[in-house]
Every structure is written in structure tokens, then in C-alpha cells.
Regions:
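Surface-exposed amphipathic alpha-helical tracts and adjacent flexible/coil segments at the periphery
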Residues: 1-25, 29-39, 53-54, 60-88, ...
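Aromatic- and glycine-enriched glycan-recognition loops and surfaces
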Residues: 42-51
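Short, conserved active-site loop motifs that form the nucleotide-linked donor/cofactor pocket
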Residues: 93
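Short active-site loop/helix that positions an aromatic residue
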Residues: 103-108
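Ser/Thr-centric signal marking residues that sit
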Residues: 115-116, 120
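Short, glycine/polar-rich helix-capping loops at beta-to-alpha or helix-loop-helix junctions
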Residues: 121-125
Length: 609
């Protein structure tokens, strides 16, 4: 018998609306921001909304994870503890956390997941976290397929969560301090200022210009939709879509796309099964290039990759549509590979490489009539970053999710019994006490029609069985009421039978992988100090946010500008024509020195005084 492993598609939710959309479009689990301390200051949610999402999702066995993944001040811990108890009582399935100080609090028996903000890159770190009580570990985005597989082999009992889609941080998560250093806004406190999306000049040690006014730290967006099966075989069990600040259209489209890809894999690979219930029926065709993206990359999944950055713009280009043939007074003609719609948003890169755009007023064959004529030249490539027709589809009901149920109507001594059994083997029965009377006309077709009317419920009839000894008559109103009571009872049983994992954190004292923590340990409060001391760490420096370290590395990047320019001594065997060190210079003339750590194959960014 094949041993089956449950695979979780984990979707983001900015708010309740996005969370419900994620359920409807195929998510097995959803992560959503806590009322406070959720690593996205702009994406907090009320306890009431979270409780409503829990109630909706659990019908489909969809799990709800709440992010509490920031580092915390001492004076915030008491409120955080209370909030966690409130989330537990609301039925939340797990918390995604960063601050080890939380493990020293009086927490309810709720599972904890180790956020990628903990910088989870090694099997030693993953094993430590699992032994400390973490039930799932979110791996660093920079890991290769081989590295993920090695971690899985070393820690086969630890569920591994990997990002498969969405925006990429150029620095290792949890190891970026540049926003705090430059703007007083800590990424580890949920207030990232998006420094990596800014434009920079790059100069050498002599002040010679290497590159001017480019977004040199801005990466493309992650897209590993073609590598899902390889990720599963490597040991990933939770596949995560980034996007807790994205709108509902993005959540619908991207979740549905990955749902379809995974379901196709599951049909062939019986050792993998989905982690929730209900079949998703879509009213649109999911297409990733219809949603926000800076272009796509599979990042470092197969080691270093030259096609990971988006130097021209940090904004969404969208889908390539064709090229400009000629420009006339109030329109331009296009040699198109796809058709445009009235109201579409179109963008292009001008002669200087800057992103420009316009809105289409109307389309006539291959003629585009912009609302305002852009300054554009023939042979310019056009992209559509807003598809009016697609967004119209996304703005209305675009999917439904139905749990299969078998309905059986049988007679009994007092009347009739309607039994309902769903795809997860939950079963209920309701009784109609009524003296039997024979019908004058055949009833079976009508009975099947009436019992199958499950439209505005989470259920869909996969089979309807009529087990009668005679052609009995039941008024349509009574049959409808019997069906309604049966559905309500089945819903109640599904909620009762849902198993919220109860897990009490163990008190542990096993050794942390290192015995000294610099500011990179992100230790912000006394409880975090206590945790690390209890696990063998002897020297503990405070978090950068608490005491900025001198000469601190502000960013640790797998993305390397020397490699991107074609001057990597390991890969290209070419000597740079410019003298190091190189510097990034921002528009307000701040300078940042680049250091290339070839031993660890990474680039470090320092602020110059």
C-alpha cells in the first residue's frame, strides 16, 4: 500500500475577503496577519474577522495560520501573550512566529511554525527548531532543490514549508537591516521601507560610473510552478504563495493556478494527496501573467541563475502583447501576439529604460487609441499590466468549492429518513415523521431533483439514492425542509469533527547550533535572551533595532552584482575593468559599499558614513 503524504497549498490573505477567496479558489491553508505584530504593519486583521475566516475555512478542512512574526519589545510581550490566547480561542490552527522570546511565555496549546524570518537555511537549524517544539519550518527562499532535499533527509519528520510564488526579498529574510538604518523602519518589526526597490548609481573605488539610475537590488518575482513535483520529491510538504499585501484578484488567480497544477500532479502521483476537502470549479482560466509580477524567476532552485533581477523597473510589467508598428495623430498600430480590450493598462520601457504607461480608450482591430498619446517609437515592445476584461471576471464570483455528499432517502416505520454522507465520511440522518401515501405519478425523478438542490451550500450531490418499497408521495415543501435540516446538521458535524491540533510546547534545553549570537540573532527582549541562555548560547548581542552595531552588514544577498555584470571570478573567470570596492549611490546621495564574499557566494551591503 502506498504511503500517502498530505500536501498543503498555502495562500496569503490581506483580509477576510482575500481569505474567503483563497478558500474558494483551492487553498489548503491560509496565512493572515494578526491584529498586531504580523510582519506587515499594513496587513493587520481584527479577531472578529479572523474568527469568521476560521469558521468558513474549517468546513473545508482548510487550516488558518496567523502571522506573529516580528521581533518584540519587552513591553509588548504581555499584550502579545493575551492576543495569542484570543487567537487560540478563535480556533486558529497555528502561529507563524519569529521571536524566540514567545517560547518563554505562558502560551496556549497552539502549534508554532518557524517563520522564514528566523533564517532557516541549514539542517542543524531546522532540527533545533523541531526539537524546540516547532511543528513546521519555513525555509529560506534562496535554497536550492538539493539543499531542500538534504534538509529533508536530515530531518525527515519535520514538515518543510517553501515559497513557490511571489515577491522576493533581495536579502536573506530576517537578515536585512537597511530599512532600519536608513529610515528607522525595521523589516523585522513589519515596517520594511522597500529599500531594495529604489534606483541607484553604481560606481567604483575611483568614482567611475559603472551603471546609472537602475534598480540594482530589485529582483523578479518567484515562480516555481513548473518545479512543483520536484519540490514535493525533495521533501516540501507546504507550498507557499507570497502576497499578504496583494489584492483579491491576485489571490484568486494565483491560488487557482497552483491548485490546478497540484491536482494534475496528484492524479499521477498517488503518494501525494491534498490536505483539505472540496472540489474547486472555476469560471475563468487562471494565468499568472495577468496578476502583478516583475517578471518571473525560479531563483536559485537549480543553483545560481543569471535571470533573477529586474533592473529597469520594480513595477509590474505584465504580459507581453506585441510591438508598435507606427504612430499616427491619435492612435498607434500594433503588431500583436494577443488582443487588447477597451480600458486596458499598457506599459513600455522608453529609450532611457524607464517604465512608461497609458490607458487604452478604445481598440479598433490593430489600432490602439490611448486616452492620452504617449511619447513612443516604432518597434517598442508593449506590455499589458492591467487587463480590463480579466479584472471584470475577477471582480465577481469566479469560483465555487463543493464537498461531495451522497444523499439517501429511505422509508422507516414512522415515515422517512434522509441520510447524508460526505467525502470525508461524516454522516448524519434526519427524520420526517409522516403517514405514507402513494403518489399518483412516478416520483423518483422529482425526488432526485429536489434533493439535489444544494446550490447555496458547501455541498454537491455526488449520488442520490432512493430506497423505497413503493412510489410514495412527499410534498415538495416538506422535502425541501428535510434537505435543509440535513445540510445544517452535516455542517454542524463537520465543524465538530474538525480537529484543531492541541500541542503544548515542551520545555527544552538542547544546544543551539552556535554558542554566540551577534545582532543577526535579532534578540530584542529579555525572554529571548532567557531562551537562548537555556539552550547554551553564552554571548548574546542585542538586536540591531535595539542597539545598532558599528560597521554592521545591512544586507546579506545571494544576488550578486559582480555576477550580474559578468565579472564573477568563479563563474565567468573574467576580471572586472573597475577597481573595487564598488558603491551603490542612492538618489539622495547615500553611499553603500559592496563586499563580495566568494567563500559563501553572497554579497554584503554596508552603509558608508
Amino acid at each position: 500500500m502506498i504511503r500517502q503524504r498530505k500536501i498543503e497549498l498555502l495562500a496569503p490573505a490581506k483580509n477576510l475577503e482575500c481569505g474567503i477567496a483563497a478558500v474558494d479558489h483551492g487553498a489548503d491553508a491560509i496565512y493572515i496577519g494578526a491584529p498586531r505584530f504580523g510582519a506587515r504593519a499594513a496587513a493587520g486583521n481584527s479577531l472578529e474577522d479572523i474568527a469568521e475566516l476560521v469558521r468558513y475555512a474549517h468546513v473545508y478542512n482548510v487550516r488558518i495560520y496567523v502571522t506573529v512574526n516580528t521581533i518584540l519589545k519587552d513591553e509588548e510581550l504581555k499584550d502579545t501573550e493575551k492576543m495569542i490566547w484570543d487567537l487560540y480561542r478563535a480556533g486558529v490552527d497555528a502561529l507563524i512566529v519569529q521571536d524566540m522570546g514567545l517560547l518563554e511565555l505562558n502560551l496556549p496549546p497552539i502549534p508554532l511554525h518557524a517563520s522564514t524570518q528566523m533564517d532557516n537555511r541549514t539542517s542543524q537549524k531546522v532540527r533545533f527548531l523541531a526539537e524546540a517544539g516547532f511543528r513546521q519550518v519555513v525555509l529560506a527562499r534562496e535554497l536550492s532543490l538539493v539543499e531542500i532535499e538534504n534538509i529533508h533527509h536530515a530531518c525527515p519528520d519535520v514538515p518543510l514549508e517553501v515559497f513557490v510564488h511571489g515577491a522576493l526579498c533581495v536579502s536573506y529574510s530576517g537578515q536585512c537591516y537597511v530599512s532600519q538604518a536608513c529610515f528607522g523602519r525595521s523589516a523585522n518589526r513589519g515596517e520594511c521601507a522597500q529599500f531594495c526597490r529604489l534606483a541607484f548609481d553604481m560606481v567604483d573605488a575611483d568614482g567611475k560610473s559603472i551603471v546609472r539610475n537602475k534598480h540594482l537590488l530589485s529582483l523578479k518575482d518567484l515562480n516555481q510552478s513548473e518545479e512543483l513535483e520536484q519540490l514535493l520529491d525533495a521533501g516540501a510538504s507546504s507550498l507557499k504563495i507570497e502576497g499578504r499585501l496583494k489584492d483579491v484578484s491576485y489571490v484568486k488567480n494565483v491560488t487557482a493556478y497552483y491548485r490546478q497544477k497540484l491536482d494534475t500532479i496528484f492524479k499521477r502521483r498517488k503518494e501525494y494527496i491534498r490536505a483539505s476537502s472540496g472540489e474547486v470549479k472555476l469560471e475563468f482560466k487562471p494565468q499568472l501573467d495577468k496578476s502583478f509580477s516583475r517578471g518571473f524567476t525560479n531563483y536559485f532552485l537549480f543553483d545560481r541563475n543569471k535571470d533573477i533581477f529586474s533592473f529597469d523597473t520594480p513595477k509590474s510589467l505584465g504580459e507581453e502583447m506585441g510591438t508598435v508598428k507606427e504612430i499616427r495623430g491619435n492612435y498607434l498600430t500594433v503588431a500583436g501576439i494577443k488582443s487588447f480590450n477597451n480600458g486596458d493598462g499598457v506599459c513600455f520601457l522608453d529609450e532611457t529604460g524607464k517604465l512608461q504607461g497609458f490607458r487604452i480608450n478604445r481598440v479598433e482591430n490593430n489600432k490602439l487609441f490611448p486616452q492620452e498619446m504617449p511619447r513612443i517609437k516604432p518597434r517598442t515592445i508593449l506590455y499589458r499590466n492591467f487587463d480590463q476584461e480579466f479584472e471584470r471576471l475577477m471582480s465577481r464570483k469566479s469560483a465555487e468549492r463543493k464537498i461531495a455528499v451522497i444523499l439517501k432517502l429511505a422509508e422507516n416505520n414512522r415515515g422517512f429518513t434522509l441520510s447524508l454522507t460526505d467525502e470525508d465520511d461524516n454522516s448524519v440522518s434526519v427524520v420526517l415523521e409522516r403517514e405514507k401515501e402513494r403518489a399518483r405519478t412516478p416520483q423518483e425523478d422529482n425526488l432526485r431533483t429536489q434533493l439535489g438542490k444544494l446550490g447555496n451550500t458547501p455541498f454537491e450531490a455526488s449520488d442520490i439514492v432512493i430506497d423505497w418499497s413503493d412510489n410514495w408521495f412527499i410534498p415538495a415543501s416538506m422535502l425541501a425542509e428535510l434537505r435543509r435540516k440535513g445540510i445544517e446538521k452535516l455542517l454542524e458535524v463537520r465543524r465538530i469533527n474538525y480537529r484543531q491540533e492541541i500541542y503544548k510546547l515542551p520545555r527544552t534545553h538542547h544546544a543551539f547550533p552556535v554558542n554566540e549570537l551577534t545582532y543577526l540573532g535579532n534578540v530584542m527582549n529579555a525572554d529571548a535572551v532567557s531562551f537562548y541562555r537555556n539552550h547554551g548560547v553564552q554571548r548574546i548581542a542585542p538586536a540591531y533595532e535595539k542597539a545598532p552595531a558599528e560597521e554592521a552588514v545591512l544586507m546579506f544577498c545571494k544576488h550578486c552584482l559582480r555576477y550580474s555584470m559578468g565579472w564573477c571570478p568563479s563563474w565567468h573567470k573574467v576580471r572586472s575593468p573597475y577597481r573595487e570596492p564598488y558603491y551603490l549611490v542612492s538618489s539622495d546621495n547615500r553611499r553603500f559599499r559592496l563586499e563580495f564574499d566568494c567563500k559563501n557566494c553572497q554579497m554584503k551591503v554596508y552603509a558608508e558614513k
